[in-house]
Swiss-Prot record:
Known partners and oligomeric status: Component of the eukaryotic translation initiation factor 3 (eIF-3) complex.
Single biological process term from Gene Ontology: formation of cytoplasmic translation initiation complex
Main location: cytoplasm
This protein's name: Eukaryotic translation initiation factor 3 subunit K
Record-annotated PCI domain positions: 46-219
Function recorded in the entry: Component of the eukaryotic translation initiation factor 3 (eIF-3) complex, which is involved in protein synthesis of a specialized repertoire of mRNAs and, together with other initiation factors, stimulates binding of mRNA and methionyl-tRNAi to the 40S ribosome. The eIF-3 complex specifically targets and initiates translation of a subset of mRNAs involved in cell proliferation.
Protein species of origin: Yarrowia lipolytica (strain CLIB 122 / E 150)
GO cellular component terms attached to this protein's record: eukaryotic 43S preinitiation complex; eukaryotic 48S preinitiation complex; eukaryotic translation initiation factor 3 complex; proteasome regulatory particle, lid subcomplex
Family that this chain belongs to: Belongs to the eIF-3 subunit K family.
Amino acid sequence: MDTLSKKPEQRPEEITAILSSLDRYNPEKISILQEYATTQCADQHSDIEANLALLKLLQFQQQPNPNKEDIICNILSMALANFLTSDFTTALHVLPSYVLDSPAADTLAESIQKLFHLYTLLDGCRFPEFWAVYERDDAHADITADVADFENLVRISITRAVDISSQAIHKDVFRSWLNLSDNKFADYVKELGWKVEGETVVVPPNKENEAKPATTTESIKIEQISRLLKRTNE
């Protein structure tokens, strides 16, 4: 899912002006872009284009920035919650390659490697394993803490994955994917407007999950038909 080509509705005009001009390379705009990234965390939306511009500026920032590590982790955490998009890998490619080297060179690399491990689990649809790993280490919650309602944002993305790929899913499987108790799961499904029939959660049909018949069209010229008919009459 491409998010770079779409301008978020929440993007302020000031940010649009920066991104559409040479100011996107101006270190003096770091504070504005940092503040916008913080707003994204609080408002639960992600603007990957603005965040990529910020990451690039942070690479070459000469002045000490005590918020640098937190900002980078926040951007990656927002991208992690939106794992159905390419935001996480796109942001990762802007960062220095050493951040994934083992052993971790510094605390930033250590945090990024933890987030990367979580991303591989989500990207591979290994959702129960994701929750187990996430809850096993308190550091994960600390790294993602600035993203408001991070866990629920992940659940929304998991739900979206089910919505576009399935017409039905076993209730226990879906509940384990969301990591919810029975009562909270029942409320969650009800809020979605989906139905539970026996042990199955029925996903409403949509243009992504509907079965489509495959059609093949072949172009045959009149001359080919004429030659074929001629051979059958010989």
